[in-house]
Amino acid sequence: MSPGSKRHISGVLLLDKASGLSSNQALQTAKRIFSAHKAGHTGTLDPMATGLLPICFGEATKFSSALLGADKTYEAVLRLGYMSTTGDAEGEISIAAGMESQYVDLTREKIEAVRKSFIGVITQVPPMYSAIKHRGKPMYTFARAGVEIERQPRAITIHDLSIEAYQGNEMRIRVTCGSGTYIRTLAEDLGHALGCGGAYLTALRRSALGGFDLPQAYTLTGLEAMPPSQRDSCLLPADSLLRSLPPVVVDSAAALSLLQGRAIPGTHPAGESLLPGRQVRLYDKAQRFLGLGEISTEGYISPKRLIRFEQSL
């Protein structure tokens, strides 16, 4: 391959992002390492944060949104009794209001009661430093200009919250949550609930996302050091993004119809009921992944996003 040329590769790279890199910087570096023609990620991680960042190449980018609503697991370190303008170590730090002493002393009973109160469906006010849009602009643009925007509380789901360690002002937590959860805000809210006036994140690591976890991930440094001929073996197939959906196998005639944009009569996968609006993974008889389909009210399977093949079926 000549220098500077791009490859039309497809697949999913599970990246272990380093701290200090924005998600886009990590994406562009991975794209360069693989000489990929097209790439995209499945949702951002803050620059300070480390951990799992799935990156899609080629045809896999069509399904990158599949993980936006997936559950996530984080490991975080909180500094209790202090606040940050950004909710993390990158902002301006100050002693939390009402904290005459910088010393925090909590009982196990207090910690356990607060921990339990945060599990389930709770409300959370999104932070100013977020990508949520206000009048067409990300909220963080207003925050950087010193403008405070009123935000409405949102319902989020905390599936599990464990206190891994606690000593002095430092608390380590592990949280599994639904989409839309801001761990920076969770840290602040935990600090308030514990009677510490607040808290901020000193470290954040995403360890799992939508069925993927860190042991499967690669670092940019490791990929750079790897022989180019071995890098493609690090990629997962595009359909790994959709493995929570039921598979439907179709014959060659139906596969051709789907690829031509036509709906086909629904076929029930084993043990599955195809209700209207249900999305499915589509395969041909050779178990080749065709793409994503959706069940219509008439029971037909309509093509939603399909893989482009260089050769005909």
UniProtKB/Swiss-Prot annotation:
Keyword field: Isomerase, tRNA processing
EC number: 5.4.99.25
Active site: D46 (nucleophile)
Coiled-coil stretches noted in the UniProt entry, renumbered to this chain: none
InterPro entries in alphabetical order: PsdUridine_synth_cat_dom_sf, PsdUridine_synth_N, PUA-like_sf, PUA_sf, tRNA_psdUridine_synth_TruB, tRNA_sdUridine_synth_fam1_C, TruB_C
Top-level taxon of origin: Bacteria
Gene Ontology MF terms in the entry: RNA binding; tRNA pseudouridine(55) synthase activity
GO biological process, one term: mRNA pseudouridine synthesis
Record bears the keyword tRNA processing: yes
Catalytic activity line of the entry: uridine(55) in tRNA = pseudouridine(55) in tRNA
Its job: Responsible for synthesis of pseudouridine from uracil-55 in the psi GC loop of transfer RNAs.
Similarity section: Belongs to the pseudouridine synthase TruB family. Type 1 subfamily.
Entry protein name: tRNA pseudouridine synthase B
Phylogenetic placement of the source organism: Bacteria, Pseudomonadati, Pseudomonadota, Betaproteobacteria, Nitrosomonadales
